[in-house]
């Protein structure tokens, strides 16, 4: 079984229920592995939400490992950007090595070979490499391609953003950089499930819980889940199993007059089977309304829980008669400051001529003036 980005130990500043949600999803994934009698489990990074997890997170992981170990099911893990140890730190998962936990690829590509059902399986791993380590990543991919080519069943574990699965300028590598002589490339880091056959089958298993509102659309389309992967004689088949314990989430963006109605509409249209958890609502309101009023309104919903609402008080555009006003008057009325109005006019002039240096000089002058005006 391949799963990823469990982020156990994650804690919300406002909702105690959220920490338990991540444990629930993690344990459901482990139960799926047991129910399907898998030979081994791989986890592709961000097992914990931080590299120094709390006692409860470690205990929950230990309990899961004990269930796997009782069935002689090893688990192979790599580090993500959240749980990668800093400098000389020790990995939390590594303390359970005596119970079948194998940490791979801390600082470089590393692999292990195990025999399952009479077939050798090479399991290799490269933990997250970004920042100053990014330049080494492509070299490690190449090194993995040149090691022990005799094995037909080859799995690579990696925790990176790969172009074209993510925004190119935020990726550490491109698909062409990946080694092509693996049977299955198990990815972590991106929280939505994705798969593509590029020679080897490559798949992001996705996260097991919704950690960001950016994941809600993906969750509504395909849920959260784990990959049950059958690999034999170099051939790979993937079965996706959805998790049922994931707390449903919706996002409501509305104005001060309509947000209550829109919350009701979205909650009534939400259909999630086999899940008794109350949906989590992320709310953003545009307009002039007090937080106290909003909190009173949402407290009336006993069928949902809410993260802290966001109130965006949209700026009021000054009403100036166009026939008598020039552009500088607009800037002065809107910004409320003569110097800022002058700066806006100068920046606009530089922008028209694409004079970036001129823009920066104007800002530096203003910054210097503000420093002189500020008290020590």
Curated annotation (Swiss-Prot):
Q: Which UniProt keywords apply?
A: DNA damage, DNA repair, Endonuclease, Exonuclease, Hydrolase, Manganese, Metal-binding, Nuclease
Q: What class of enzyme is it?
A: hydrolase
Which residues bind Mn(2+) 1 per the record? 5, 7, 46, 191
Q: What does the record give as the active site?
A: 82
Q: What is its EC number?
A: 3.1.-.-
Q: Which HAMAP family match?
A: Mre11 (MF_02044)
Tell me its family: Belongs to the MRE11/RAD32 family.
The record's note on quaternary structure and interaction partners says: Homodimer. Forms a heterotetramer composed of two Mre11 subunits and two Rad50 subunits.
Name this polypeptide is given? DNA double-strand break repair protein Mre11
The species this protein belongs to is Thermoplasma acidophilum (strain ATCC 25905 / DSM 1728 / JCM 9062 / NBRC 15155 / AMRC-C165)
Q: Which gene encodes it?
A: mre11
């Amino acid at each position: 079984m391949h799963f990823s980005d469990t982020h156990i130990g994650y804690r919300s500043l406002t909702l105690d229920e959220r920490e338990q949600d991540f444990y629930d999803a993690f344990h459901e994934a482990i139960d799926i592995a047991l129910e399907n009698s898998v030979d081994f489990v791989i986890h592709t990074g961000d097992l914990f939400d931080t590299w120094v997890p709390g006692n409860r997170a470690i205990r929950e992981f230990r309990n899961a490992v004990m269930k796997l170990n009782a069935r002689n099911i090893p688990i192979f893990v790599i580090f993500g950007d959240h749980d990668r140890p800093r400098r000389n730190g020790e990995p939390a998962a590594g303390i359970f090595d005596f119970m079948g936990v194998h940490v791979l690829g801390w600082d470089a590509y590393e692999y292990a070979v195990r025999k399952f059902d009479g077939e050798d399986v090479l399991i290799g791993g490269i933990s997250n490499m970004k920042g100053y380590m990014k330049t080494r990543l492509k070299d490690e991919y190449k090194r993995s391609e040149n090691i022990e080519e005799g094995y037909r069943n080859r799995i690579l574990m990696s925790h990176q953003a790969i172009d074209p699965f993510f925004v190119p300028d935020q990726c550490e590598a491109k698909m062409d950089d990946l080694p092509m002589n693996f049977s299955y490339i198990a990815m972590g880091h991106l929280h939505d499930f994705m798969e593509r056959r590029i020679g080897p089958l490559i798949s992001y298993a996705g996260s097991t819980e919704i950690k960001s509102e950016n994941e809600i659309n993906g969750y509504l389309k395909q849920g959260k889940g784990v990959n049950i992967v059958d690999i034999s004689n170099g051939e790979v088949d993937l079965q996706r199993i959805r998790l049922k314990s994931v707390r449903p989430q919706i996002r409501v963006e509305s104005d001060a007059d309509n947000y209550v109605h829109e919350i009701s509409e979205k909650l009534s249209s939400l259909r999630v089977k086999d899940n008794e958890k109350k949906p989590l609502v992320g709310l953003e309101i545009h307009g002039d309304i007090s937080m106290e009023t909003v909190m009173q309104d949402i407290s009336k919903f006993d069928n949902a829980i809410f993260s802290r609402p966001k109130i965006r008080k949209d700026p009021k555009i000054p009403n100036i008669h166009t026939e008598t006003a020039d552009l500088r008057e607009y800037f002065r009325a809107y910004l409320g400051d003569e110097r800022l109005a002058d700066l806006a006019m100068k920046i606009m002039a530089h922008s028209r001529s694409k004079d970036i240096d001129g823009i920066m000089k104007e800002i530096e002058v203003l910054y210097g003036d503000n420093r002189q005006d500020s008290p020590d």
